Amino acid sequence: MTAPAAQPSVARRLARGGVACVALFPKVDAALKTNGCEEAWNPDNLVCRATRAIKAAVPEIGVMHDVALDPYNALGHDGLVKGGRIVNDETVEKLVLQALAQANAGADVLGTSDMMDGRIRAIREGLEAKGHEDVLILSYAAKYASGFYGPF
């Protein structure tokens, strides 16, 4: 899709055409990428702003987000890197923060492409602790086995 300001009109057209859900993937400005990936859980990041704009215009359309740090990571990894190694548990903590920012913005479905051990339980517990019991977590097994994952 396009910039957040244009997305409501695109979402309206999609909904009129019978599209029930849209998936948002950010194209993060290089200046916002860091080794700590802080932009991933910024409540005013690109996908959160876009989601709020879409939901305000078309509340009935579903919005799906990807939960992964690679778009925000200066090193390009899905995990935080310390001492040349991916640190799983610290990464999972940050993925929970990202999932909460996305759910708070109005995401209905979270696809977890990050592949960190223990992330699903941690994300589910984090979502439920903050009242997001109805936010779905998509298995990437379903996504990989479909035509939906075509661009990659």
PLM regions: where:
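Alpha/beta enzyme core
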Residues: 1-152
